């Protein structure tokens, strides 16, 4: 069970831009629409064995919600949400079901981890997917310039090892970028500006949490 207080909010990636810092340097930032997310469930060690809060975000047609979830939401007078995620934190008992969490939960200068689903690239070769150098451009190479080369021995070991980097579907996987700095917060518009890039396309779902590394 974690002993660290973790703040978190669900939102969307709006895109990238650039701003100037105090010294006049250009800083690339990603604009995130943070919240409003609603606390839909509070996990406690006494009832669930761990401490966490469940956040809901986005709109969905109530008819698309299954019966168990719909009954729970009606019992607590909650509006159905499209996305749900749990954030483990030691102070979950301080939250209440129905509480709204917005962008002002973070302050400029804080370190955060941002989780999103990367852009899908489809079927890609080893040069694009893994950064292979390919074979020679000349000197006898025939129609194999972008091939991976050897993928294993013949009689020994006589098989292809698991985890061999090969061509395949690229992207559309969950990734987390750690220790991004919050550049600024616009509480009125519900926006977070974080330094650097964030996984996923514009409009993609993101989870912004307190950085787990750093010891602060």
Swiss-Prot record:
Q: Which InterPro entries match?
A: Ribosomal_uL3 (IPR000597), Ribosomal_uL3_bac/org-type (IPR019927), Ribosomal_uL3_CS (IPR019926), Transl_B-barrel_sf (IPR009000)
- A Gene Ontology biological process term: translation
Lineage, top-rank taxon, reads Bacteria
The question of whether Oxidoreductase is a record keyword is answered with no
Q: Which residues cross the membrane?
A: none
Keywords carried by this UniProt record: Ribonucleoprotein, Ribosomal protein, RNA-binding, rRNA-binding
Q: Could you tell me which residues belong to the region Disordered?
A: 135-156
Q: Name one GO cellular component term.
A: cytosolic large ribosomal subunit
Which GO molecular function annotations are given, in alphabetical order? rRNA binding; structural constituent of ribosome
Family per UniProt? Answer: Belongs to the universal ribosomal protein uL3 family.
Q: Subunit structure, per the record?
A: Part of the 50S ribosomal subunit. Forms a cluster with proteins L14 and L19.
Q: Which PANTHER family match?
A: 50S RIBOSOMAL PROTEIN L3, LARGE RIBOSOMAL SUBUNIT PROTEIN UL3C
- Report the protein name in the record: Large ribosomal subunit protein uL3
Q: Which lineage do the record's taxonomy fields give for this organism?
A: Bacteria, Bacillati, Actinomycetota, Actinomycetes, Streptosporangiales
Gene behind the chain = rplC
């Amino acid at each position: 069970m974690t002993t660290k207080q973790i703040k978190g909010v669900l939102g969307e990636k709006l895109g990238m831009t650039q701003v100037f810092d105090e010294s006049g340097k250009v800083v690339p930032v990603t604009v995130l629409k943070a919240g409003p997310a609603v606390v839909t469930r509070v996990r406690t060690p006494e009832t669930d064995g761990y401490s966490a809060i469940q956040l809901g975000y986005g709109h969905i047609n109530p008819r698309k919600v299954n019966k168990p979830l719909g009954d729970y939401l009606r019992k607590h007078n909650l509006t159905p949400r499209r996305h749900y995620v749990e954030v483990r934190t030691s102070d979950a008992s301080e939250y209440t079901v129905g509480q709204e969490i917005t962008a002002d939960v973070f302050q400029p200068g804080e370190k955060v981890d941002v989780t999103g689903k990367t852009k899908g690239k489809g079927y890609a070769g080893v040069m694009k997917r893994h950064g292979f150098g390919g074979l020679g451009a000349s000197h006898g190479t025939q129609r194999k310039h972008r091939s991976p080369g050897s993928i294993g021995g013949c009689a020994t070991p006589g098989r292809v090892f698991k985890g061999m980097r090969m061509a395949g579907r690229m992207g559309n996987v969950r990734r987390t970028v750690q220790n991004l700095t919050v550049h600024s917060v616009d509480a009125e518009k519900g926006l977070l500006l974080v330094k650097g890039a964030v996984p996923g396309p514009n409009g993609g779902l993101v989870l912004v949490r307190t950085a787990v590394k750093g010891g602060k």
